[in-house]
Amino acid sequence: MQPQLSRPQTASNQVRKAVSGPWSGNAVHKAEKYFITSAKRDRDGKLQIELVPASGRRKLSPTPEMIRRLIDGEIEIYILTTQPDIAIDMNKEIIDMENRYVIDFDKRGVKWTMREIPVFYHEGKGLCVELHNKIYTLDQFFK
């Protein structure tokens, strides 16, 4: 069985060395999970991102070391779709994503819908997200 990338649309210029990811088994045990909890602009208009691990113990910033760990697959970073700092109209996007990703695992009507958006490193652009095969830098994605 061939290993598959965690995001099926991953292009060759999207850097990710590890092949396990959020849609392959229980990803919580494969990599440290972080969430972007705040994305505010400073006085100069530069985006200031705040990360919190899934354990919720401390607040961090995306350092070059964390980006290297993301590329190596040691950590995974997500944005919750309820994040108030998102600039894109997520109400429309989530409806489309729910229609696309709803899976009835046990055939009893119990369904899972995507509520976390994975963040990845795109060579030349930096940290990015992908919605409907369109790549947004975090600078474009947040207000």
Swiss-Prot record:
One of its GO terms (biological process) is photosynthesis. It comes from the Bacteria. It holds the Pfam family RC-P840_PscD. Keywords: Electron transport, Photosynthesis, Reaction center, Transport. This is P840 reaction center 17 kDa protein. Component of the P840 reaction center. Residues 1-24 are annotated as: Disordered. Disulfide bonds: none annotated. Residues 1-15 have a biased composition (Polar residues). It comes from Chlorobaculum tepidum (strain ATCC 49652 / DSM 12025 / NBRC 103806 / TLS).
